[in-house]
Amino acid sequence: MSSDTNLSNPPKVGFVSLGCPKALVDSEQIITQLRAEGYSISGTYDGADLVVVNTCGFIDEAVQESLDAIGEALTENGKVIVTGCLGAKKDAAGHDIVSAVHPKVLAVTGPHALGEVMQAVHTHLPKPHDPFTDLVPAAGIKLTPKHYAYLKISEGCNHRCSFCIIPSMRGDLVSRPVAEVMLEAENLFKAGVKELLVISQDTSAYGVDVKYRTGFWNGRPLKTRMTELVAALGELASQYGAWVRLHYVYPYPHVDEIIPLMNQGNVLPYLDVPLQHAHPDVLKRMKRPANAEKTLDRIRAWREVCPDLTIRSTFIAGFPGETEEEFQTLLDFIAEAELDRVGCFAYSPVEGATANDLPGALPDEVREERRARFMEVAEEVSARRLQRKVGQTLRVLVDEVNQDGGIGRSSADAPEIDGLVYIDPAAKASQRYKTGDFVNVKITGADGHDLWGEVA
């Protein structure tokens, strides 16, 4: 095949991306490499020469969704390569789950396996002779809107929580070199990104695997450590008038060091801290650190340093052996801590998790009932805290402009998981601001999730 033919009719790869933001970053890296090697990305099964499905395998519902997506791709296209967390899962006999259910897939890899995925693509769909490296931006190909992006700083996790199997799929913590992280952040800001969302399995543990060794960025030393990285990212973001938001922050002692940076405006006053529960006995069964009293003290101290701090967390209701008293402790904690944003999952057994062997498994209806009670309390807390913002003027990042006005997010709202700010008036909204702009909005109303306001 001639070079001209390759250029005019490049091989086409379809892509299905499932799962969490960490998986989304993996998808972006694969798509970036595909484009760099001259492949084009097809938006339909019919138009693709083969399909890559990036899967999730964390909970049973995600496993089924991934298996269904693989089945659909096989039916609609027939040539499918599977990657992601589900690709690393084995059944009781030690066979990989994907191949057992869908034996016609071309190849199966685990998560964060760019090299293996590309090797499989090359085997079943040879790459063209002329790479389109000049068509790939320095920031890479992104699956998020142009004005925000995820920045993954590490892979894997050193924790062994009893309800989780991520370490068995993604391995132990491996931190990215600090200079590499900073370069990616700079390229993203140069490409117009206005909000950088820092993610990992455990952001607070960044650098522990390399003993916090010192790297270099722009000719100056920079430790591979969360505090130093966050400070450098905040300084860089300020040069572009952009936001930096932190996710998956475990409440280690050194987290206290970044709260002053938030109060100074270096990074957003927003902490995503996965607490999971409040009762010490449940936390022990979960193999999680901390206890409710110490956590409450930490939260109070953080808010004294940074009064505008928004705290998001996730919890599990109905964990094996959870008594009504233990669950009530969790409800009391939520009310007293006044967490701004929370998510709650009814416990769901995950194949391969050690929590499956714990006694006291609760019926589905009990788990769901407790989740509903939890969310009722959490929404009351959220409504109270949001009501306090009425009358304030907030800086809002615009996500969408339509005939009804603008829709955006404040510093308290991460994309997809938190609330929204609805911006009035609708008249001439598209002439006053556009997606990706920052606008000042005076808040005029609130409910349990969202805010309403007018351009100030």
Swiss-Prot record:
Cofactor requirement:
[4Fe-4S] cluster
What is the enzyme's main class? transferase
Q: Which GO terms describe its biological process?
A: tRNA modification
Q: Which residues form the TRAM domain?
A: 387-456
Which spans of this chain does the record mark as coiled coil?
none
Its main localization is cytoplasm
The molecular function terms of the Gene Ontology recorded here are: 4 iron, 4 sulfur cluster binding; aspartic acid methylthiotransferase activity; metal ion binding; protein methylthiotransferase activity
Looking at the record's lineage, which domain of life comes first?
Answer: Bacteria
Name the job this protein performs. Catalyzes the methylthiolation of an aspartic acid residue of ribosomal protein uS12.
What protein name does the entry list?
A: Ribosomal protein uS12 methylthiotransferase RimO
